[in-house]
């Protein structure tokens, strides 16, 4: 069952043209360089844990099957500990993807997904349990769900909702082969047993969307997400999912399309989880823009979509990570992904809302320009001091290892950088398998 809503568009092409003030040089630090022989190649972002600890995953691909790692700050340095290395055998997971960022539950358990492996080769959802306090033992990994086949196209992470339920999506499979959103319920009363998977909604590939590419848990048990394709114009859509009142347990959820993208400079192919801001406003990214959706007022009506900033034809490429919305500003990463011969490795950017009346133009500041071998990608976080922490796909000297970086929007940076330029002869072909278009 689904409800499809006609859309209110305020994003005419004229709104896609924005001013941009001069790039400000800000404090940049390379905090830690990964080595593929210890943690696996290609880091795909970090998430915060307790006491300043960061957790993340490596994709593997060129170097093994990937891993889950911990980064611990101490005395101005960061120490990496590999918590678990995937084997790709005997039902274990193998390799992660662009959005497969783990989540850290309140009990310290880590949950995440892999693209391959599992009991049927279609990927898996895993749980990592920390050792008993003070024991110093290893983390314990369990595969809590295996996707039935490789056709499921599991490229998502999972998010946690009420009662420990995990939600996620696949870009394939479902009743129509266009992707689906699923729920994983833990064993009853937290004891031993089997997690239960349930399909909440299957996309048809029509105006309801196709190939989900981001999911966020909202208040009241509602889910918000984006679909890369489909919608009224075939360029992607933002959707809402919620249980149907009075429906029996296990019934499909109701989908409502909140916004359909027009394509081109007006935005196309959304990617990444929407961010819920003040007043229920949704913020998100497409391959070439940052957008916002404003919910209807108390009198009802449609959601109103507008483009905040267009990256159309910019040298640094489009947004490549979930954005952060803090104190009226938006922070994100841009990258060309594999475009290492284009003379840019992407950027960390800041978008500031207009100071004047509503309807003014947002301004963009490039906080840091990355060299061509870096390719910032995946989730990143803001620490308690307002600095941004993230990872890159590539590392110094053109390696696939990546590094952890810090960008401080409030401090000045000299023109010199401690990144190393890419060596000659590495251009050509798609350097990274982590392409955001996956179908």
What are these regions (language model features)?
Residues 2-439:
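Extracellular beta-propeller repeat domains
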């Amino acid at each position: 069952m689904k409800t499809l809503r006609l859309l209110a568009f305020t994003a005419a092409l004229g709104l896609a043209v924005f001013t941009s003030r001069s790039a400000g040089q800000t404090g940049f630090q390379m905090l830690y360089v990964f080595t593929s022989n210890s943690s696996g190649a290609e880091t795909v972002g970090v998430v915060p844990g307790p006491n300043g600890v960061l957790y993340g995953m490596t994709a593997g691909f060129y170097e093994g099957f990937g891993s889950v790692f911990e980064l611990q700050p101490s005395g101005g340095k960061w120490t990496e500990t590999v918590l678990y290395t995937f084997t790709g055998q005997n039902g274990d997971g193998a390799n992660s993807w662009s959005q497969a960022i783990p989540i850290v539950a309140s009990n310290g358990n880590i949950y995440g997904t892999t693209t391959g492996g599992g009991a049927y080769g279609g990927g898996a959802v895993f749980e990592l349990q920390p050792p008993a306090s003070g024991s110093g033992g290893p983390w314990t990994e369990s595969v809590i769900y295996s996707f039935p086949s490789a056709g499921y196209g599991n490229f998502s992470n999972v998010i946690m909702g009420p009662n420990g339920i995990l939600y996620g999506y696949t870009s394939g499979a479902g009743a129509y082969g266009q992707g689906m959103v699923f729920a994983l319920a833990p064993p009853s009363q937290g004891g031993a047993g089997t997690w239960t998977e349930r399909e909440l909604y299957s996309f048809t590939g029509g105006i309801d969307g196709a190939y989900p590419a981001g999911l966020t848990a909202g208040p009241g048990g509602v889910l918000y997400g984006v679909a890369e394709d489909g919608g009224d114009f075939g360029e992607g859509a933002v959707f809402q999912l919620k249980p149907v009142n009075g429906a029996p347990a296990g019934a499909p959820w109701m989908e409502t399309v909140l916004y359909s993208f027009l394509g081109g400079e007006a935005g196309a192919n959304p990617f990444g989880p929407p961010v819920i801001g003040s007043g229920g406003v949704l913020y998100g990214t497409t391959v070439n823009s940052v957008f916002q959706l404003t919910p209807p007022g108390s009198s009802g009506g449609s959601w109103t979509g507008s483009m905040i900033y267009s990256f159309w034809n910019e040298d640094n490429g489009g947004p490549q990570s979930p954005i952060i919305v803090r104190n009226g500003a938006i922070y994100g990463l841009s990258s060309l992904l594999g475009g290492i011969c284009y003379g840019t490795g992407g950027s960390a950017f800041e978008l500031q809302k207009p100071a004047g009346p509503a309807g003014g133009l947002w301004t963009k500041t490039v906080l840091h320009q990355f060299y061509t071998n870096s390719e910032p990608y995946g989730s990143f976080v803001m620490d308690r001091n307002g600095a941004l922490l993230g990872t890159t796909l590539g590392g110094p000297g053109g390696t696939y290892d990546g590094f952890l970086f810090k960008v401080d929007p409030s401090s000045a940076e000299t023109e010199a950088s401690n990144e190393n330029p890419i060596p000659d002869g590495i251009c050509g072909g798609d350097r990274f398998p982590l392409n955001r278009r996956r179908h």
